[in-house]
Swiss-Prot record:
Source organism of this protein record: Mycolicibacterium thermoresistibile (strain ATCC 19527 / DSM 44167 / CIP 105390 / JCM 6362 / NCTC 10409 / 316) (Mycobacterium thermoresistibile)
Cellular compartments per GO CC: cytosol
The organism's taxonomic lineage, starting at the top: Bacteria, Bacillati, Actinomycetota, Actinomycetes, Mycobacteriales
Record has Hydrolase as a keyword: no
PANTHER family found in the cross-reference section: MITOCHONDRIAL DNA REPAIR PROTEIN RECA HOMOLOG-RELATED, RECA
UniProt protein name: Protein RecA
Amino acid sequence: REKIGVMFGCFDYSTRAQLADGTTEKIGKIVDNKMDVEVLSYDPDTDRIVPRKVVNWFNNGPAEQLLQFTVEKSGGNGRARFAATPNHLIRTPGGWTEAGDLIAGDRVLAAEPHRLSDQQFQIVLGSLMGDGTLSPDPRGRNGVRFRMGHGADRVDYLEWKTALLGNIKHSTGENAEGARFVDFTPLPELAELRRAVYLGDDGRKFISEEYLKALTPLALAIWYMDDGSLTVRSEGLQQGTAGGSGRIEICVEAMTEGSRIRLRDHLRDTHGLDVRLRQAGAGGKAVLVFSTAATAEFQELVAPYMAPSMEYKLLPRFRGQSRVVPQFVEPTQRLVPARILDVHVEPHTRSMNRYDIEVEGNHNYFVDGVMVHNSPETTTGGKALKFYASVRIDVRRIETLKDGTEAVGNRTRAKIVKNKVSPP
């Protein structure tokens, strides 16, 4: 008595594999012609998407059933499509998962262009703590829209920030009061950041410990310029107050209560700043108040990253130090989670043949942007038990749940696969 061997699934003829030159080709054509091509493949050692040779081709005959997947993506018509056998392994945030165990709403890993440099990502982080927002792509694509907006008296500052993001497509708008807004093209690389920051339904921003640890002085400067104010106590004319003195207040009303406390503690513990929270004005808005000494220390930290039009928020001795220049990078393909929009059984056609390829080294490739396992190997199984009494519920990890970037749990799905008295 032998266990049933396992074959790791296949795709229909028309499923398009992504080639190393950026084009796509039907997997059936690659197999039938044994095309000597390189495909895109994920290298887990370098965390990069790289070209790899196809080293074997498989036509595994007719399939009993094929599942048609539709997955969100940022380019083209906003949809990735492929058809796979139910046992083909698809990469998800939680690991490899059989196609038949995935449903609409689950997320898979897909290759999407990343356009932001490290400097530009810091601008986004700082802006989100201030006046910036992230919103879903209005057309339902994989990506979120970053928006910056300021009043008519701060247009120069908005233009300075926009220039630092100058290689990202954007549009500008203006309201009746003269406030100006800049909306950037949806960026898939910011989707996880949006999920981490907008956790609740009240619109307040959740700033985690990991978010705070990622902040550089540039991000802190953006946050201060967006939402901070300086009350000058002394212009520095007296010998005892040379260089001037004052107190900073930064509004944190848009953050959750816990985020405000984490931010206060971060500034204290990481930068040694004497800051406290208080309620300001008739509306009782939450603000962070800096002591006179902390104000000087903070301004020394952020002075090299201030926009020229915002130097009025600096004490006189810290002005004129700005040295920020745009830092652009070429787009690179990176893995991001993408939501499954639809899964259904493909209607039977005259040709239901199953196709697959073997990829050198990494043993994975991409079909219309979605990461899948290559499947040449089979297992012969071995001796089977009369009854599978030890396995009655199949529990699979679907994805990792995060608080910011910290893993706090797993999303799982349980499926009854055998009862304790059923033979194999």
